[in-house]
């Protein structure tokens, strides 16, 4: 009986550790997603501004 009880405790500990590891992994994944989203948005904005500035410079030449 004591062996079955220790197996149950070990199983509970293993499932708890698995949940903790998965939670930490999810937090890292979510943090990296937010970080890359902010970087991509800033890159998109700077590219958009650069394109608008080149269009405004080229517009008088075409006339």
From Swiss-Prot:
Its main location: membrane. Induction: By heat shock (shift from 30 to 45 degrees Celsius) (at protein level). It is a single-pass membrane protein. Pfam families: DUF2633. The keyword Metal-binding does not apply. GO terms for cellular component: plasma membrane. The chain crosses the membrane at residues 20-40. It is found in: Cell inner membrane. InterPro entries: YfgG (IPR022576). GO terms for biological process: stress response to metal ion; stress response to nickel ion. Keywords: Cell inner membrane, Cell membrane, Membrane, Stress response, Transmembrane, Transmembrane helix. This is Protein YfgG. It comes from Escherichia coli (strain K12). The gene is yfgG.
